[in-house]
A protein has these predicted regions:
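N-terminal hydrophobic/helix-forming segments and targeting peptides
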Residues: 1-420
Length: 420
């Protein structure tokens, strides 16, 4: 389908943006957010560098943006300081999994930690290395033109590696900066390259071959941050009357959801909704035999079931999305959602929670792949759900008591007969 030139202003019964191609201007905003260099612990490029200016562009008077001391998270608050309203926090995380400099060899090879990347899938790809100026700590620079390598050439590999029986050892992975000549290590150290310096993949997203698809690095989880940012845009045009919304950009998710726990602990929202990527299980090689729940990209966003998820909140989201004819898939989890939805539980306070996801392919690679319909479905699904809850109780909005008294009672269930 051909792309439109401008973004739709809001959901409606007649216009269904989740059934249409993402407009070019909206896709460009998504590309900018995902392209921000924001490795774990250094997320300000995305949060304050890209997202905050976007939020300030549309936020009305009376809204506020909160920043924090110990992390680069961000919260756009529709009703700052108003604790009388039920509050709903939606969180995406800005941190990207990264590699780190481990050591520098005499010939200039920079051996690295691969973190959450499978070594085999990063070899040969271009990366960005960030380091501080030795004489001016805090003055960060970037080195472009490097690639991740391992054994140097197939000619130097072991027979078992050539046959595919053996993979690459994480400690064999290094950054190639094409260094040659004398004192290669000292020249790199003089530039400021040192142990611990972050390295990230360098491939901004592009539209894919198939309609409404896209691919590139770090859909995990620029997508959640993009969705949260765009949700604020819709709410600015069609505000809620009774609810306080906290549109949040978290940090440190990839190493334990610590940013979400800090944000949730600060604001203590009544409701927390984590937004993150999920898996397209139908397209995942060798997973069909495991009989996974058939999530697939292009079929809509996924609503999580299990772990700390509050059933009544899921019920409300499903009711709202069914009424608006927004497709919703199911993501089944066990003891942990694996997302920032765990923030309140980790912070240790009472909170309604759920998690939504966007099924993607090739997670934690340079070619993560998604479908714009899933993002648009999640965006308008959350927008519709917020307005649905805002209109409850004859227009007075959902209350904290509604959540307290609507926990499912399985002891009151009726026996189901086959009926055939």
């Amino acid at each position: 389908m051909a792309s439109k030139k401008s973004s739709p202003k809001k959901s409606s019964a007649k216009i269904k943006p989740w059934t249409m191609s993402m407009p070019d201007d909206q896709f460009e905003r998504m590309r900018q957010i995902l392209a921000a260099p924001s490795p774990i612990g250094l997320e300000a490029a995305m949060s304050t560098g890209v997202i905050e200016p976007m939020m300030r562009e549309y936020m009305p008077d009376g809204w506020a943006i909160h920043r924090f001391k110990g992390h680069a998270g961000l919260v756009l608050d529709t009703h700052p300081g108003d604790t009388s309203r039920p509050s709903i926090m939606l969180i995406g995380h800005a941190d990207k999994i990264r590699m780190q400099v481990r050591s520098i060899s005499e010939d200039g090879k920079i051996y690295i930690n691969t973190d959450s990347f499978l070594p085999n899938v990063i070899v040969g790809h271009e990366v960005l290395l960030f380091s501080e100026e030795p004489e001016k700590p805090g003055n960060w620079r970037r080195i472009e033109g490097g690639t991740i390598e391992a054994i140097g050439a197939i000619h130097f590999s072991e027979p078992s590696q050539r046959s595919g029986d053996k993979g690459l050892s994480p400690d064999s992975i290094y950054l190639e900066l094409q260094m040659h000549g004398e004192k290669a290590k000292k020249r790199l150290e003089k530039l400021g390259v040192k142990a611990g310096d972050p390295i990230i993949l360098n491939r901004p997203i592009k539209r894919g071959f198939s309609p409404d698809t896209y691919y590139g690095a770090y859909l995990d989880n620029g997508l959640g941050c993009f969705m949260v940012t765009e949700l604020g845009r819709l709410l600015a045009e069609s505000p809620l009357k009774n609810l306080r919304v906290l549109l949040s950009i978290a940090t440190h998710e990839e190493i334990g959801r610590f940013g979400a726990a800090a944000l949730a602990g600060d604001f203590k929202p009544d409701v927390l909704i984590g937004t993150d990527v999920g898996h397209d299980y139908l397209a995942a090689p060798n997973l069909g035999a495991k009989r996974m729940n058939p999530e697939a990209m292009g079929k809509g966003f996924a609503l999580t079931v299990g772990s700390i998820v509050t059933p009544y909140l899921n019920q409300l989201i499903m009711e709202a999305c069914q009424k608006a004819e927004i497709p919703v898939q199911t993501s089944v989890v066990g003891r942990d959602t694996g997302t920032d939805a765990m923030g309140a539980a980790l912070a240790g306070f009472d909170c309604v929670a759920t998690s939504i996801g966007f099924p993607i392919r090739n997670m934690h690679t340079i070619s993560e792949t998604g479908h714009t319909a899933d993002i648009l479905g999640a965006l308008h699904g959350m927008f519709t759900s917020l307005h649905f809850m805002d209109a409850m109780n004859k227009g007075k909005g959902i209350t904290r008591e509604d959540f307290k008294k609507n926990h499912p009672r399985l002891d009151l269930t009726k026996r189901l007969e086959s009926g055939w």
